[in-house]
Amino acid sequence: MLARWILAGLALGLSLGNLAHADTRNVRILGRAAVIAGGGVKLQWAASGFEARVVGKSLTATIVDEWGDNWLNIEVDGKRSAIQLKAGTADYVIFSGKPGVHTVRVTRRTNSQGGATQLLDVRSDGSITPTAVPKRRMLVIGDSITSGYGVEGADQHCRYSKETQNADAAYPSLVARSFAADLELVSMDGWGLYRNYMGSPPTMKQMAWQTLPTDATPWPIGKSFPQVIIIALGANDFASGDPGDGFTADYQSLIEKLRVAHKNAHIFGVFGGILDGERYAAGRTAISTTIAKLKKAGDSRVHFIEFTLPNAPRRWGCDWHPGLDAQQRMARTLQTEIDQYVAW
């Protein structure tokens, strides 16, 4: 049985239906995706992918990876594994096991800079149908911390590698899973809102609204309807010192634009996890002050969260990024704050 990937409605978590053949089975896309001319979808954001209900004993996917730099996380009935993709087009056995009803989830483990991944089709000996669309939805706009950069590294002294990145082990994915919520993760390693850690614009000021990093087509963000929005930016902006009023102006503008698009969403501005000293203090002040200003002006659904992380085993991953325990601690902090403000 062949299921072609056709994006219906371009809405987060909406099932994909074949508009030409009524008997074609469906899958549900996770995160942002772009339609490929001739069939299929293109993914590039970390943690994006698909989920399906398979009645059968196997599932195979035809995938095109741009450079062979990406890994996928695979979850079948709660059991997790990972595969490294090859450059070019190849067929991958997602699972092969006992006949029955299986829930299959496939997501990008690696970052946006690893190039695009095209999902052309999936095949099964049985049927493929979309899983149910969760009512709870989260949008996270972030950087390397939210995409799980180096999270599985031994300590802060290891150098980053694709093998040590795992978006599913980063706090956005952990929180979304804890609330059974869909996650729309928009993150770029090394990118800031006002300025990037290295390199020239564009920044997340532009990227936050795009379908993919390499596809400037505006994402129809008004169709996503997240109840919770996390802005996890600032570390790269303040990495080389205080960027000044340009950052605070862009931060306020981002919140205001998100508020227009999502009038009832709770917006959380988070900070912490990687910087220290004056850089940390400047970033914390800029973000908390901006949020306090908006709250005073009448937006009661905007909140500031500070991640405080004590030194402990697995505090650090590669290149001084948060490790496994740090990501889990950030997830618990965010869960507590969401519980306080959101009726989930």
Where do the protein language model's features map onto the residues?
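N-terminal secretory targeting modules
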Residues: L2-A3, G17-I141, I145-A167, V342
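Bacterial N-terminal signal peptides
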Residues: I6-G17
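Surface-exposed acidic, glycine-flexible loop patches that form ligand/cofactor-binding
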Residues: I128-T131, T214-F225, E256-H262, K296, ...
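Sec-exported extracytoplasmic/periplasmic mature domains
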Residues: T146, A180, E184, G234, ...
